[in-house]
C-alpha cells in the first residue's frame, strides 16, 4: 500500500534520459556535478550531502529544461542522507 509519494517506484522523473554515476559528460549530456566532479551545475562543490539534497530537484528540473537531450549526474556517496539521494535518483532514472 502506498501512503506517501516517496514510496512510489517512480518518483519525479525528468523527461530526458538520466545516466547515474557519471564522472564526465558524455556526448549531448548536461552534467550535474558533485564534489570533485564538476559539471554544468553542481549539487555541492564541497561534497555536502545536505546541500545536495536541498538542490536535487531544482537541478533536475533545470537540466530537463536545458537544450541538451540527455542528463548525467555525478556519483553521490551512500553515507547518511546520501542513501536517500541515491534512492531518489534511482527512481528518477527508472522510466
What are these regions (language model features)?
Residues 2-95:
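A C-terminal functional module that forms or caps the active site or interfaces directly
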Amino acid at each position: 500500500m502506498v501512503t506517501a509519494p516517496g514510496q512510489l517506484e517512480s518518483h519525479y522523473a525528468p523527461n530526458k534520459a538520466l545516466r547515474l554515476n557519471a564522472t564526465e559528460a558524455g556526448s549531448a549530456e548536461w552534467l550535474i556535478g558533485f564534489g570533485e566532479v564538476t559539471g554544468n551545475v553542481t549539487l555541492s562543490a564541497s561534497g555536502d550531502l545536505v546541500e545536495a539534497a536541498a538542490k536535487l530537484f531544482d537541478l533536475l528540473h533545470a537540466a530537463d529544461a536545458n537544450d541538451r537531450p540527455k542528463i548525467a549526474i555525478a556519483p553521490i556517496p551512500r553515507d547518511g542522507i546520501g542513501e536517500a539521494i541515491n534512492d531518489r535518483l534511482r527512481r528518477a532514472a527508472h522510466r
